[in-house]
């Protein structure tokens, strides 16, 4: 279980040896295992995820991408579909990579393939989330497909081109307009803005 306490960033080689020893010591004390991993640090990346649907018969399609770069305390706050500031060539690579990864493992479910994209639009793979994500609704808004409904039908054995799902090819999935989702979080301004709980006492639908 990775938390922000488990992550360290160092930009100078001369800091590395000391940081390495400290990180191993902390890991050993906290988890009983002093194994650590070193990764390339990507400064100010975009967090981009590609929505995937795959059935039991080898058919897999993407439903374009979401930009989840606006985050606070390592938690997503704003999600936008599609990503508003990526080149189309970069988006096409993201789709290609997402499909290649999921086709290789014969993926059959709704899922999300997550990437980081740096300022030069180099792409780095993070992980595959084999489930529905909270932000799937922005993808539903711009594609018109009910991802939750499709997932249930896939689990029941339906193919993507079945009457219940009606995705006959990648070309059937069109992206229209933009959708934005914002999450409401609670923080205590009198306690250094630490995460807090609260009660919603009023709600007004725009």
Q: Model-predicted segments: where are they?
A:
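ATP-dependent carboxylate activation and anion-phosphoryl transfer catalytic cores
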Residues: 1-206
């Amino acid at each position: 279980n990775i938390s922000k306490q488990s992550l360290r960033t160092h930009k100078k080689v001369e800091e590395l040896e000391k940081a390495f020893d400290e990180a191993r010591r902390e890991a050993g004390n906290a988890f009983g295992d002093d194994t650590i991993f070193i990764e390339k640090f990507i400064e100010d990346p975009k967090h981009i995820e590609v929505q995937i649907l795959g059935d039991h018969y080898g058919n897999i399609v993407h439903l374009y991408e979401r930009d989840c770069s606006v985050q606070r305390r390592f938690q997503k706050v704003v999600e936008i579909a599609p990503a508003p500031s990526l080149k189309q060539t970069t988006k096409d690579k993201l789709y290609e990579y997402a499909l290649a990864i999921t086709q290789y493992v014969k993926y059959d479910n709704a899922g999300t393939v997550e990437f980081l994209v740096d300022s030069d639009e180099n792409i780095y793979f993070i992980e595959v989330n084999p489930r529905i994500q909270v932000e799937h609704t922005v993808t539903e808004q711009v594609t018109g497909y009910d991802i939750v409904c499709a997932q249930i039908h896939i689990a029941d054995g339906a193919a993507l081109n079945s009457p219940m799902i009606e995705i006959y090819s990648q070309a059937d999935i069109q992206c229209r307009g933009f959708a934005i989702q914002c999450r409401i979080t609670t923080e205590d301004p009198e306690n250094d803005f630490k995460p807090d709980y609260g009660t919603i006492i009023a709600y007004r639908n725009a």
